């Protein structure tokens, strides 16, 4: 599997940044190529995207989620990928975000694109767009504050600002 790591800082409180990142259905607004993300339940998502000019769909499971700290996922079908997003408060108004993603390019075109740094560049663009989006708004559009461990929701928590 190929690995991408990106770290960036956002001029917003950690709860604002984390809450916005939990709004998976809004990912197409800042991720080029992602056409749709449907949240099926608290821990399952369905993705539809165009990758290297080819339509791809996959299902993903949130395997760990701790408010204001981290979200980890893995694909369960389709395009093979997994990753973690970590949120670290630097002060009351600034947050460091660390994104680690692993994926398996399939076929010649995807492998060639990977070698040329296309995926890394797309991820870089996505984090820059996310940063601009949340910094310009200064508030989240919603948030999911529940916890997930081992792919299962644990304890209280749920949607906010709906």
Predicted region positions:
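Beta-strand/loop substructures that line and gate deep hydrophobic ligand-binding cavities in soluble
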Residues: 63-64, 74-132, 136, 141-143, ...
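Intrinsic-disorder/low-complexity, polar/charged segments enriched in Ser/Thr/Lys/Arg/Asp/Glu/Gln
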Residues: 3-7, 44, 57, 70, ...
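Glycine-centered tight beta-turn/hairpin loop motif at sheet-sheet or coil-to-beta transitions
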Residues: 1, 53-55, 78-80
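Short, cysteine-centered beta-strand-loop-beta hairpins and adjacent loop/turn segments enriched
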Residues: 52-59, 105-109
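Hydrophobic ligand-binding cavity/cleft-lining segments
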Residues: 1-44, 129, 133-135, 149-162
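Short, hydrophobic/aromatic-rich segments at coil-to-beta transitions
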Residues: 39-46, 65-73
